[in-house]
């Protein structure tokens, strides 16, 4: 009886679960339909989703005839959603009952939610994606135009957040304009849509780490309405504070004009954008020199004129294909460059640059999960450099530089580049693969120093007409060559767990003028988050290769002894060195046969915390090791006997990759985008050391590169950058950019060629560290005294008297041979700068419909360096200079810029 009762209860319980399910199966229905475009053409592979009120989601993809279906759909109310790239998404409500559901007919329209034609294939945003790192800096067009910048230059903002250590010996970041790599931004400022720094730092698509590159996207035209914009900026000395080294309140004026027009070209399938800007800059440079006649100050006009023109069209050729064509032209004429500080007005030189670029891109999305882009790029760059004076150059260390600049150069470069890249999503994987082929054709003419250069150790040597060196180039100044660069990459970003994502990839770099072809760059990145996604931890590591710069090949081909010869005379006559016979030994330039591409190894660990809807705090540590960095070494420098290994030559400079660097930095960040406030804050604690400053850097001791190991030229322990915009009532905006930095180092040199290698970059030895900083002793062999006797340097060089001194009574010692003071031991000045902008927008007429344009005018007032704090550039590091340890140049003091912008 008991057993029978248990079985009865079991059957009742089971039937209570199975019977409703059986009834539900009997009531389940079929939901089906077709998807087509406005012309009636069926759309294949559209994404279709069916959402239930309970939160469940069913997914389907249309077949070749645009058909979709969902089987086993229970009764209830549902939301049907259809999406396809390039079209506006469609949503419709439907009810499913016991009877058959009517077949759905969905018609897609071309997307007009966005005013630009775009096409892309990607998943919905995931905080774990490699390109969603909160440590990146993303500045859209609205934020860029609101921040206080001189002449609306967007790079003035983004350069604040670039890590110079990520560029190794190439100090400037790489700039990618619409995916094309370059060194400058040659498009109008108003054509910039957005700028990004440090997005997806380990992406194999790029050769540089994230903090060493700037990605710029240009603007496309609107599909719905026409926009016309006109802006004008002016800065005038009458509104500015006087520069610290300007003794006469010199006049100066800068004017900048920009305009743009964009809108639909052919219906809503084609758009255009045309823009340009013009800069008229009459700036000043300030000379602070010590000549034979005494202290000399002068203000020199530095006129500059630039023009940029830009045109772009975007056409939706088919629903799945977009053709984009961009052309830009630029002209830059800049006179009296190089003047200021120790450089007298006659040392000026002028440059004229012309650039043309054409970019054609075809973007296709054959399926919602696949995107392919092909880019054809062609560029023409014409650059000319010429000196104001052709007189021989006179370089007096630590005092003044006069004569001509001895610069005469013409560069013509023609570039052709092909890019192919693809993104493919499959299951838990996101694949990225592609390649770049770039050919560069160069015609290089360099007649620099054909007029000769005299070098003096100090002002006393100049007064006594005793230069220690004279150099002069002779021969054929023209070379032509080509350089081919190839790179290809592959990466897979995969989801290992719901809150764990891994990126692995490989990049391979090849270059035609390098015999080493094993530049393989593996990358790996890992991202993990908490269940709610508000805390993300990222780690990564990778190798990044540099390309050999074309300037290295240019200099090698020109000065290897087959085109030009460089004559070097020690202890020449002055002002005439005399005739230079053909028998004088030359100096040549060679390339290390074992040279290869420099590379950096980067590793990082960081955390990102989302505090509110749009509030993020970040912290990350980055280590970067540079290996095989560029440098130059004189392999024919005198040995201990005073003789050169190859007596038929003076100097044999050799380009090589023997340098190294090491950088560590910790960065704390805060970013918020609230209703009225946008704020970006970055604080960086860093330290960087290396033993080379770049391709042309010569060590003080040519037999000991490691002796140059010291603080990097750009090393700054502390950097704090803040950028923000506060929207005030009545269409007022208040914006700020502030920068606080500790000092960069400066190198302390003796001013003499103490090791007889014809280069006055030798450093002193250390005396008594407690003696006055500007006190030094000099061996008599350098100042017509007794060799081996130490004399007071200031009295001998500045007072004209030889007074013996004890080594314990001076801070520095100038002795024959190599000094023991390290490189970059001087500590430069700190910097503090705050820039503000107050703007007011007046709406003249609001848009009445989606094809109309709001007409408005905006007034802006910018104040740069509102604190009016004197920020020196750096200190003089030449011991033999009367102004050793003092500044001779400063950044601009407080400046005011007034602007007006029309939009209609």
Can you annotate each of these PLM segments?
Residues 513, 596-601, 610-904:
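Short, solvent-exposed micro-motifs at the edges of structured domains
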Residues 210-212, 226, 255-259, 307-311, ...:
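Hydrophobic, lipid-facing positions within transmembrane beta-strands of outer-membrane proteins
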Residues 121, 230-236, 274-280, 325-329, ...:
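Transmembrane beta-barrel strands of outer-membrane/channel proteins
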Residues 250-333, 350-377, 507, 522:
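Transmembrane beta-barrel wall of Gram-negative outer-membrane proteins
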Residues 21-128, 132:
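Periplasm-facing N-terminal accessory domains of Gram-negative outer-membrane beta-barrel systems
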Residues 88, 92-107, 115-220, 236-246, ...:
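Periplasmic N-terminal accessory/gating domains of Gram-negative outer-membrane beta-barrel systems
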Residues 187, 204-206, 220-226, 266-270, ...:
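Short loop/turn motifs that connect adjacent beta-strands in outer-membrane beta-barrel proteins
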């Amino acid at each position: 009886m008991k057993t029978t009762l248990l079985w009865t209860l079991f059957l009742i319980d089971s039937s209570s679960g199975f019977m409703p399910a059986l009834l539900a199966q009997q009531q389940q229905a079929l939901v089906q339909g077709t998807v087509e475009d406005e012309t009636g053409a069926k759309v294949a592979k559209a994404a279709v989703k069916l959402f239930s009120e309970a939160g469940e989601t069913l997914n389907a993809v249309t077949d070749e005839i645009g058909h979709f279906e969902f089987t086993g759909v229970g009764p209830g109310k549902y939301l049907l959603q259809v999406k396809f790239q390039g079209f506006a998404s469609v949503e419709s409500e439907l009810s499913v009952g016991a009877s058959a559901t009517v077949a759905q007919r969905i018609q897609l329209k071309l997307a007009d939610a966005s005013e630009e034609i775009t096409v892309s294939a990607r998943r919905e945003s995931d905080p774990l994606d490699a390109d969603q790192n909160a440590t990146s800096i993303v500045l859209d067009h609205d934020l860029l135009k609101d921040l206080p910048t001189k002449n609306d230059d967007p790079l003035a903002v983004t350069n604040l957040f670039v890590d110079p250590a990520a560029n190794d010996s190439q100090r400037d970041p790489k700039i990618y304009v619409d995916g094309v790599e370059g060194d400058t931004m040659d498009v109008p400022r108003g054509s910039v849509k957005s700028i990004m720094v440090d997005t997806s730092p380990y992406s194999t698509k790029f050769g540089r780490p994230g903090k060493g590159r700037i990605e710029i996207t240009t603007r496309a035209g609107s599909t719905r309405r026409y926009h016309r914009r006109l802006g004008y900026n002016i800065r005038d000395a009458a509104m500015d504070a006087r520069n610290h080294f300007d003794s006469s309140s010199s006049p100066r004026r800068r004017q900048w004009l920009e305009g743009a027009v964009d809108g639909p070209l052919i219906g809503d399938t084609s758009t255009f954008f045309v823009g340009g800007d013009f800069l008229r800059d009459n700036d000043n440079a300030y000379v602070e020199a010590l000549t034979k006649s005494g202290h000399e100050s002068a203000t020199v006009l530095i006129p500059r004129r630039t023009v940029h023109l830009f045109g772009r069209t975007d056409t939706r050729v088919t629903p799945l294909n977009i053709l984009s064509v961009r052309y830009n032209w630029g002209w830059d004429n800049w006179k009296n460059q190089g003047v200021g500080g120790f450089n007298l007005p006659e040392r000026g030189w002028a440059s004229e640059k012309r650039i043309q670029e054409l970019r054609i891109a075809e973007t296709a999305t054959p399926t919602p999960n696949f995107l392919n882009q092909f880019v054809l790029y062609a560029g023409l760059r014409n650059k000319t450099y010429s000196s104001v004076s052709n007189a021989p150059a006179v370089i007096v260390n630590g005092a003044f530089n006069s004569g001509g600049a001895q610069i005469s150069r013409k560069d013509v470069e023609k570039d052709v580049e092909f890019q192919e890249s693809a993104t493919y999503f499959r299951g838990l994987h996101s694949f990225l693969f592609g390649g770049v082929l770039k050919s560069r054709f160069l015609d290089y003419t360099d007649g620099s120093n054909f007029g000769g250069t005299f070098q003096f150790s100090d002002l006393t040597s100049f007064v006594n007409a005793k230069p220690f060196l004279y150099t002069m180039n002779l021969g054929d100044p023209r070379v032509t060559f080509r350089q081919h660069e190839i790179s290809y990459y592959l990466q897979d970003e995969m989801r290992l767990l719901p809150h764990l994502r891994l990126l692995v990839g490989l990049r391979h770099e090849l270059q035609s003028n390098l015999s080493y072809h094993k530049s393989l760059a593996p990358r790996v990145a890992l991202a993990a988050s908490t269940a709610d996604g508000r805390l993300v931890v990222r780690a990564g590591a990778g190798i990044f290769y540099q390309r050999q710069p074309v300037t290295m090949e240019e200099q090698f081909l020109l000065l290897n002894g087959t085109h030009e010869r460089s004559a070097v005379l020690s202890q020449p006559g002055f002002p005439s060195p005399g005739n230079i016979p053909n028998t004088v030994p030359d100096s040549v330039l060679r390339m290390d046969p074992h040279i290869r591409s420099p590379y950096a190894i980067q590793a990082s660990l960081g955390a990102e915390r989302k505090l509110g809807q749009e509030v993020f705090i970040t912290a990350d540590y980055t280590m970067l090791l540079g290996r095989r960095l560029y440098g130059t070494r004189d392999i024919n420098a005198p040995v201990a006997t005073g003789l050169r290994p190859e007596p038929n030559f003076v100097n044999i400079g050799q380009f090589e990759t023997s340098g190294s660097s090491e950088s560590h930095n910790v960065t704390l960040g805060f970013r918020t985008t609230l209703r009225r406030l946008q704020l970006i804050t970055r604080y960086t604690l860093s330290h960087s050391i290396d033993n080379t400053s770049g391709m042309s850097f010569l060590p003080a001791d040519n037999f000991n590169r490691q002796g140059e190991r010291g603080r990097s030229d750009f090393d700054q322990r502390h950097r704090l950058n803040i950028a923000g915009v506060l929207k005030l009532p009545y269409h007022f905006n208040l914006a700020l950019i502030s920068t606080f930095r500790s000092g960069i180092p400066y190198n302390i040199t003796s001013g003499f060629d103490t090791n007889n290698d014809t280069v006055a970059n030798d450093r002193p030895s250390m005396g008594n560290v407690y003696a006055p900083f500007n006190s030094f002793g000099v061996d008599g062999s350098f100042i017509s005294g007794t060799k081996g006797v130490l004399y007071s340097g200031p009295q001998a060089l500045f007072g004209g008297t030889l007074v013996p001194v004890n080594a314990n009574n001076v801070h520095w010692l100038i002795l024959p041979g190599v000094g023991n003071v390290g490189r970059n031991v001087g500590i430069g000045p700190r910097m503090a700068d705050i820039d503000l902008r107050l703007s007011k927008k007046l709406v003249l007429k609001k848009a009445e419909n989606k094809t109309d344009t709001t007409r408005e005018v905006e007034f802006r007032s910018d104040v740069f360096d509102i604190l009016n704090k004197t920020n020196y550039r750096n200190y003089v590091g030449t011991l033999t200079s009367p102004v050793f340890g003092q500044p001779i140049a400063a950044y601009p003091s407080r400046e005011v810029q007034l602007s007006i912008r029309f939009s209609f």
